[in-house]
Structures are given as structure tokens and as C-alpha cells.
């Protein structure tokens, strides 16, 4: 009986997740190109971090690189979301 309840809960969660993603896509459709939006987000993030870390020593300055992926590698962290066509990716930044 517990197994059946657990399976039903997992099935409910699995069905609910794609519905939420489809709802978010419908709400955030603005007509702008998605790749440009991701590039603007990455540029704004890098500019904000550069302003926060105004360091004169070149050895202490970091170069931040961001890319849109389905998952982030070790040493990267999720800094936002990217939208390319109908897919939602993670904005993974290293630096």
C-alpha cells in the first residue's frame, strides 16, 4: 500500500513539472529573440560583478564566462535561465 502511494506521488510530480514549464513559457513569450535575452543577462551579470569587484591588481581579477547548458559542470554555478526557441536552459557561469 505504501509503495502504491509513493508511485502515485511520483507520477503526480512528474506530470506537474512539464505543465509548470509550459505555463512559464506562455507567460514569458515577449516576441524578442531568446538568444539576445540570454546574452543581455550574461553581460549584465558580468558588469555587476565587475562593479562589485573593482580590483586594481590584475592577478586578482577574474574572467567570468557564462554559457547556456542543460546542466552545469563542476566549478560552475547556476546564475539564471536561458531561453532558446522553446527550450529552457541553465545559465552556467565560471570565474
Curated annotation (Swiss-Prot):
Q: Which residues of the precursor form the propeptide?
A: 20-61
- Read off the InterPro entries from this record: Alpha-defensin, Alpha-defensin_C
Task: Mention any one GO cellular component term assigned to this protein in its UniProt record.
Answer: extracellular space
Where is it made, tissue-wise? Highly expressed in spleen, and expressed at lower levels in intestin and lung.
Name where it's found.
Answer: Secreted
Keyword field: Antibiotic, Antimicrobial, Defensin, Disulfide bond, Secreted, Signal
Chief location of this protein within or outside the cell: secreted
Cystines in this chain? 66-93, 68-82, 72-92
The signal peptide here is 1-19
GO process terms (BP):
antibacterial humoral response; antimicrobial humoral immune response mediated by antimicrobial peptide; cellular response to lipopolysaccharide; defense response to Gram-negative bacterium; defense response to Gram-positive bacterium; disruption of plasma membrane integrity in another organism; innate immune response in mucosa
What family does this chain come from, according to its entry?
A: Belongs to the alpha-defensin family.
Quote the function comment for this protein.
Has antimicrobial activity.
Please state what the protein is called: Defensin-A3
Native organism: Ornithorhynchus anatinus
